[in-house]
Regions:
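Charge-rich, well-structured scaffold segments of protease-associated domains
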Residues: 3-8, 14, 61-214, 220-222, ...
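Active/ligand-binding-proximal structured segments within catalytic/core domains
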Residues: 7, 16-66, 243, 253-266
């Protein structure tokens, strides 16, 4: 791993026997940066970034190239990060990577596609309205601290993205899509030296705006609001109980992953486990942690 001159972090993986190559770009900003007046803006930007760049202006050029060369591409917006990724036949990593790099150098964010993608985002929102898992997730947010960004609506809709949204989109991109907020991973059949040269050539032009990481100081739950109980009527005929424990950030312990140990212990399904006992008592037929 290394950093480019623009402070963009890079991890390279060389596999001479690979028949596929891949790359992923993670930006350390997500829906936590949505303006109060534009819930879902980070997700909307994720959609718009695929639709042409100055170097490759055709809105479908990137998708067509990846698909024509045996690959697929996608992206997702989470609370604290946004991730773009693709895989492609190993022989086509360089041209794919060049197209990919332009997302973070000179995207068009073309006005003529704003309304189309606004409706696409709204369709994603509507598709999950009757999904019990999403309904439960949304209901849980209602008891969180409204001052914490995690409590906000993040998908986006025709209402939250109404009007002239492009200036807000450009402002968000210009403010947060900075090289110092990005981490790139590239895997290919080329040697590490060749991969490094490729990345330096294509990604050194990503501007470094010295963006400061977002820090949310408000507690996830306000003092005195816990313990709390939510009773949610599901649309499907299912019964479940979910126990949620807010904990302090363990980001500094990413290597040890302490919460994974707790999760594995609680979720163990063998002899003497919590699930085994619940099954014996006729109280549960499954458990996940």
């Amino acid at each position: 791993s290394f950093k480019l001159s623009n402070d963009l972090s890079v991890l390279l993986i060389s596999d001479p026997n690979a028949d596929k190559a891949s790359a992923a770009m993670n930006i350390a900003v997500g829906s936590n940066a949505d303006p109060e007046t534009r819930p879902g803006l980070a997700h909307f930007l994720e959609h718009m970034l695929f639709l042409g760049t100055e170097k490759y202006p055709d809105a479908s050029a990137y998708q067509k190239f990846i698909q024509a060369n045996g690959g697929h591409t996608n992206a997702y917006t989470a609370h604290e990060n946004t991730n773009y990724f693709f895989d492609v036949s190993a022989d086509n990593l360089k041209p794919a990577l060049d197209r990919f790099a332009q997302f973070f150098i000179s995207p068009l964010l073309d006005e003529k596609y704003v309304d189309r993608e606004r409706h696409a985002v709204h369709s994603e929102y509507r598709a999950k309205i009757r999904d019990d898992a999403r309904r439960t997730y949304s209901a849980t947010k209602q008891v969180m601290n409204p001052s914490h960004t995690y409590s906000n609506f993040t998908v986006g809709s025709l209402k939250t993205l109404a009007g002239d949204v492009r200036p807000d989109l450009v402002k968000f991109y210009d403010q947060y899509y900075s090289a110092n907020m990005m981490t790139l991973v590239v895997e290919g059949k080329e040697s590490l030296a060749e991969l490094k040269a490729m990345v330096e050539q294509m990604f050194s032009a990503v501007p470094n705006k010295q963006t400061k990481p977002i820090s949310v100081k408000a507690p996830l739950f306000e003092t005195g609001t816990l313990p709390a109980r939510l009773s949610i009527k599901t649309l499907k005929d299912t019964n479940s109980i979910t126990l949620t424990f807010p904990v302090d950030s363990v980001r500094d312990h990413w290597h040890e992953k302490p919460l994974h140990y707790i999760s594995d212990l609680v979720g163990y399904e063998g002899h003497g486990s919590l699930l085994a006992y619940l099954k014996e008592q006729g109280l549960a037929d499954g458990l996940s942690s």
